[in-house]
């Protein structure tokens, strides 16, 4: 996301100095990447299948194609998680330690949750991909005649 930032007058919260503006930009980038992860998870769920049942065998090729799409969506989330973590780290440096932008408290909370480890989309993505790979393996091991 390489777009220029608009004037601080149009920010979601009141910006009074350059230090606040710098932290705002870092938090904005972090928040944007978190939202992109959420969107990729939602998109992946459209194509995902939670479990493979024996009666899915006649349609296994279609399911496998959809599961590959879901896998691609989930894997893309790792890129955004890496970016979000980087921006959260930048917004967490010493010079911002006692600077809180109260107008965007939810972004500050996300930053703190990333810092403390309570918000970790890598774990979520790992879990979803592990489950998805199991479903793919189950479908691949099915014979079309098993139904």
Language-model features: locations:
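Helix-turn-helix repeat elements of alpha-solenoid scaffolds
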Residues: 1-20, 66, 73-76, 81
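Soluble non-cytosolic domains of exported or imported proteins
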Residues: 31-34, 38, 61-64, 68-71
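Charged, low-complexity interaction regions
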Residues: 56-60
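C-terminal amphipathic alpha-helix
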Residues: 63, 68-147
